[in-house]
Each structure stands twice: as C-alpha cells, then as structure tokens.
C-alpha cells in the first residue's frame, strides 16, 4: 500500500468505520453521513469524492473558506467542480463550512449564492468571539444586528446558516 493510500484510508477509518452500524441494524436504514473535507484538503476534488465514496459515506461537508478545499475567491469556478466530482461518485454535498460571519464580507454573497445554486442547503458560519466582560446576553446583543443582516442574505440566497459553539482554549 502506498503511503498516500494509507493516509486516506486511516483518515477515513478514524471517523467513519464504526459510526452508524448499530443504528442501521436497529432501524433497517443506513444513515447518510457527510465527511468534513478538512482532513483530506490535500486531495483534489475527484480523489476526495472517490475516497469518501469508498469509505461508504453519503456526502461531503466541504470547506469553502480561506485555505479550504474551495477558496472564496474562486467559488463560482471551483464549487461546481467539487460538487460535480462528488455527484459522479453518488455523493451529496448539502452542507459546507465557511468563515462567513457577516453579510458585508467581500465574498459572502458570492459564496452563499453559488452554494445554493449547487444544491448546498446549509452552511456552518465562521466563529464569533465571546466577550467575557459582556457575558452571554451581552455577547448576543453585540452580534444581533450582524446576524440579522446575515439572515437576510441567507434568505435572499436560499440557504440556511448554522452556528457551532466552539471553545478555544
């Protein structure tokens, strides 16, 4: 086995091999799991899709952000190529990860519009800084207008934004 093949297999096995087998037996339906593309960013779109399909997963959660699988500056050219590569392997691309935290960001509308046109339904937003001095309610208030503007853009583009709480040590 080549080193590259071993690394692909090991990366996928770490997160995919055991997930869902008990649930699939219990309900008789195989869950459709999407693989977050970050661990395999060094692969091109075709190799990524082939690897994820070989692992038995149902889709790809693409990173569409600076230094991601798709760079925001090239989203109109590259995201359709990435999605097509996935579809050729029978995979879905219904979700993506971005660095978007504001509707005013230079590539926000282009990324969201292109993603929706490619069939992406939801995206994970970038992270907001928690302010210890403001606390939870104050931090929410601080970001309320920014999130409202992003919600308006999401509706315009036909996509749903999701936020992940992510603690930084």
Predicted segments with their positions:
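N-terminal secretory signal peptides
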Residues: 1-2
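N-terminal export signals
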Residues: 5-25
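Active-site acidic/histidine proton-transfer and metal-coordination neighborhood
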Residues: 10-16, 47-50, 66, 92, ...
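C-terminal segment of N-terminal export signals and the immediately downstream linker at the start
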Residues: 20-43, 47-51
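Short, well-ordered coil/turn segments that N-cap beta-strands
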Residues: 28-33, 56-58, 87-94, 119-121, ...
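Active-site mouth loops of central-metabolism enzymes
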Residues: 33-43, 97-105, 137
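Glycine-rich, proline-tolerant flexible connector loops at the mouths of alpha/beta enzymes
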Residues: 63-81
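Alpha-helix-loop-beta-strand connector modules within alpha/beta enzyme cores
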Residues: 79-95, 150-154
